[in-house]
């Protein structure tokens, strides 16, 4: 049994707390997933972990969207969709 029972309280400690950073949210999310995958959490703790995980995923998506928007503003027209290679030469930018 790789996980100690002490890992479970983090799933429900502060369910609405905003993570300090994207990296902190991802680390907490990884811990929650590992706890849930272990199968050792009781039903209520699993539900709390799922809810917290959903909050963390939403937070991470929002952070990524904000960062993407900032990159778009900084790069202007330099960004092209990944599949749009027909009119660009990636080597020509160097």
Swiss-Prot record:
UniProt-annotated location(s): Cytoplasm
Molecular function per GO: exodeoxyribonuclease VII activity
Domain of life, source organism: Bacteria
Any one of the GO BP annotations: DNA catabolic process
E.C. no: 3.1.11.6
General function of this protein: Bidirectionally degrades single-stranded DNA into large acid-insoluble oligonucleotides, which are then degraded further into small acid-soluble oligonucleotides.
Family the entry assigns: Belongs to the XseB family.
Protein name: Exodeoxyribonuclease 7 small subunit
Species whose genome carries this gene: Ralstonia pickettii (strain 12J)
Gene: xseB
């Amino acid at each position: 049994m790789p996980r100690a029972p002490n890992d479970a309280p983090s799933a429900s400690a502060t369910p609405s707390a905003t993570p300090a950073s994207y990296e902190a949210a991802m680390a907490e999310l990884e811990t929650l997933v590992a706890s849930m995958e272990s199968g050792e959490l009781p039903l209520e703790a699993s539900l709390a972990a799922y809810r917290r995980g959903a909050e963390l995923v939403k937070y991470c998506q929002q952070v990524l969207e904000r960062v993407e928007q900032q990159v778009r503003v900084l790069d202007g027209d330099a960004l092209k969709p990944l599949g749009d290679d027909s009119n660009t030469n990636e080597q020509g930018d160097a």
